[in-house]
Design a protein with these regions (language model features):
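Short, surface-exposed coil-to-beta transition loops
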Residues: 63-65, 89-95
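Residue-level signal for tight coil/turn positions that link beta-strands
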Residues: 73-76, 101
C-alpha cells in the first residue's frame, strides 16, 4: 500500500506533467473533488475536471508552478502553491487530499486568481 506522501507526490508529478491518465490513477471510483466550481463525483466527473484544466489554465508548457509548503498527517496531505499562467497569476492555491488504501478519496482545491492585463 502506498503512503499518503507517496500518493500526494505522484499526484503532483502527474498533474505537472499534464498526464491525464496518470493523474486519474490516484482516484478511487467513489472519489469526490470539491472546488469553487462545484463538486465532481467519481472518476468520470473528475476526468472532465482535469480535462478542462489541462486544456485551459494548466495547459502543459504554459505555466510555472511553485510548491510553497507541503504537510502530511495520517491520511491527509495539504499543499500550498502558487502559479503563473498565461492569462492569470494564482497568488494563493491550496489542495487538501484525503487518501485511503492508496487512493485519493476526497480532494479540495481553493485558489485566488489575479488576472493579467
Amino acid at each position: 500500500m502506498s503512503s499518503t506522501k507517496d500518493v500526494a507526490d505522484h499526484h503532483l508529478k502527474a498533474f505537472l506533467a499534464g498526464d491525464l491518465d496518470e493523474t486519474l490513477k490516484d482516484y478511487a471510483e467513489g472519489s469526490v473533488f470539491i472546488s469553487p466550481n462545484g463538486i465532481a463525483h467519481g472518476r468520470d466527473e473528475i476526468h472532465a475536471v482535469f480535462n478542462r484544466l489541462f486544456a485551459g489554465l494548466f495547459a502543459p508548457g504554459t505555466y510555472t508552478f511553485t510548491v510553497d509548503m507541503e504537510h502530511c498527517e495520517g491520511d491527509v496531505a495539504y499543499t500550498l502553491w502558487l502559479a503563473e499562467c498565461a492569462d492569470a497569476g494564482i497568488v494563493l492555491g491550496t489542495d487538501t487530499v484525503v487518501i485511503r488504501d492508496g487512493a485519493i478519496m476526497t480532494q479540495t482545491v481553493a485558489l485566488k486568481l489575479a488576472p493579467k492585463g
